[in-house]
Swiss-Prot record:
Record-linked InterPro entries: aa-tRNA-synth_II, aa-tRNA-synth_II/BPL/LPL, Phe-tRNA-synth_IIc_asu, Phe-tRNA_ligase_II_N, Phe_tRNA_ligase_alpha1_bac, Phenylalanyl-tRNA_Synthase, tRNA-bd_arm
Protein name: Phenylalanine--tRNA ligase alpha subunit
Subunit structure and binding partners: Tetramer of two alpha and two beta subunits.
Origin superkingdom: Bacteria
Gene coding for it: pheS
Biological processes per GO annotation: phenylalanyl-tRNA aminoacylation
Positions contributing to Mg(2+) binding: 264
Annotated CDD domains: PheRS_alpha_core
Keyword list, A-Z: Aminoacyl-tRNA synthetase, ATP-binding, Cytoplasm, Ligase, Magnesium, Metal-binding, Nucleotide-binding, Protein biosynthesis
Family membership: Belongs to the class-II aminoacyl-tRNA synthetase family. Phe-tRNA synthetase alpha subunit type 1 subfamily.
Transmembrane segments: none
Location (main, coarse): cytoplasm
């Protein structure tokens, strides 16, 4: 069986010379395929006598086992070579400085909202919430805004297509109505209802977009209703809040007469800083006023017995003033170079 030994050595040499899996399979076919050299020898066993067939068959099987072992060894070597090449291509230079995980942080408007909530919670207010998709009744009618009011125009308000009485709320004031109605449903059977003291942070929508306006922006609504709530209470709450928010006792606050359909009397709130880049300039901050009797009635509250004040301010505007940002749109563009300054 010297020829079988030579065949095994020849196959092992061809397997070792195969540079890849394709060449290895081609070499395998020459020995173990249907017309391979070893397969042909197996086919010739039928021509031998029984005793010779037994001896020759054992030798051929031994040679086949040796060839298959050489084949599998080469396959494993090729797999390892591929892995080594892959690892070399993906190798990391452990001497290079590491890249740490980027530190995240709250959005500056989120920081402002949290600060506003904390300051008002400290004086007994609770945070309320309401839907951003509102009915015309909650957004306008119940807030004493008549049907012919310009704010109802499609030029100022986003209405839902196919639903003339459904819109994206233009302010957080509808939550005033929802809060009062819920309050009356809960405490209306009592001789005297507890006070309502809520703030309503949230997103609102108007048809507007420029450096100081966005079609989506934030607003914080405030409402205090009780048996003896006055405009003096409103002035005290707002002035105290603004000085704490801007962390200065030198802040000047003034209330300028204005008009809102849902408050009477109404005022615009302006502030003036005594130092810094904005020193001496009066800047509009918020709108406020005593809740209009009609709004109290729509909320199910007797205006002959209860009074209240409401205010609305823009956290986006407050954030711009607090951090010295000149373009409101920067807050919503998602530019990490800008946002990372507020970590």
């Amino acid at each position: 069986m010297d020829k079988l030994d030579q065949l095994v050595q020849q196959a092992a040499a061809e397997f070792a010379a195969a540079a890849d899996g394709v060449q290895l399979e081609q070499a395998k076919a020459r020995y173990l395929g249907k017309t391979g050299a070893l397969t042909e020898r197996l086919k010739g066993l039928g021509k031998l006598a029984a005793e010779e067939r037994r001896v020759a068959g054992a030798e051929i099987n031994r040679a086949k086992d040796a060839i298959e072992a050489a084949l599998e060894a080469r396959r494993q070597a090729l797999r390892e070579a591929v892995l080594v090449a892959q690892l070399a291509a993906e190798a990391l230079d452990v001497t290079l400085p590491g890249r740490g995980a980027a530190q995240g942080g709250l959005h500056p408007v989120s920081r402002t909202l949290e600060r506003i909530e904390a300051l008002f919670r400290s004086i007994g207010f609770v945070v309320a919430d309401g839907p951003e998709v509102e009915t015309d009744w909650h957004n306008f009618t119940a807030l004493n805004t008549p049907e012919n009011h310009p704010a109802r125009s499609m030029h100022d308000t986003f209405y839902l297509e196919g639903h003339e009485d459904v819109l994206l709320r233009t302010h957080t004031s509808p939550v005033q109505i929802r809060t009062m109605l819920d309050h009356v449903a809960r405490y209306g059977d009592r001789e005297s209802m507890p006070e309502i003291r809520v703030i309503v942070p949230g997103r609102v929508y108007r048809v507007d977009s420029d450096a100081t306006h966005s079609p989506m922006f934030h607003q914080v609504e405030g409402l205090w209703v009780g048996e003896s709530v006055s405009f003096a209470d409103l002035k005290g709450v707002i002035a105290d809040f603004l000085r704490k928010f801007f962390e200065t006792e030198e802040l000047q606050v003034r209330f300028r007469p204005s008009f809102f359909p849902f408050t009477e009397p109404s005022a615009e709130i302006d502030v003036a800083f005594m130092s810094g880049a904005l020193k001496g300039r009066w800047l509009e901050i918020a709108g406020c006023g005593m809740v209009h009797p009609n709004v109290l009635r729509f909320g199910g509250i007797d205006p002959e017995r209860y009074t209240g004040f409401a205010f609305g301010m823009g956290p986006d505007r407050l954030t711009m003033l607090r951090y010295g940002v000149n373009d409101l749109r920067l807050f919503f563009e998602g530019d990490l170079r800008f946002l990372s300054q507020f970590r």
